[in-house]
């Protein structure tokens, strides 16, 4: 019937909405993700962080948690979209996001895989 009741309902609805680029969808994704978290679904925090970062990136502002990567076609490489330096790894951890050093390592792994694909 389309009614959201359980933590899973809220989580999956928020996860679907966070794929959108529309600010109103991202706002709703954030709300639903927090509701999922309040109902006991820890992954709701991570989806909320993704929605918040995606909104900031759309506004050309530094992201807070570090969930958004961009591809630079000219350099043929991935890059972590700029992150607000005031956000701590403790804050990231509370949202289910890895520390900044690990996020930067993930970028290197993406670029290593990209280079490997080019060489094959």
Question: Which residues fall in each region the model found?
Answer:
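Amphipathic alpha-helical repeat scaffolds of TPR domains
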Residues: 5-18, 43-58
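Alpha-helical linker/edge segments of TPR/alpha-solenoid repeat scaffolds
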Residues: 22-26, 54-75
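Alpha-helical protein-protein interaction scaffolds
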Residues: 1-36
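TPR/TPR-like (Sel1-like) alpha-helical repeat modules
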Residues: 27-42, 69-72, 86
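Structural helix-adjacent loops and short alpha-helical linkers that scaffold large soluble proteins
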Residues: 22-25, 43-44, 81
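N-terminal alpha-helical interaction modules that lie
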Residues: 1-7, 61, 65-68, 98-105, ...
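Intrinsically disordered, compositionally biased glycine-rich interaction modules
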Residues: 111-120
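Amphipathic alpha-helical packing elements
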Residues: 78-112
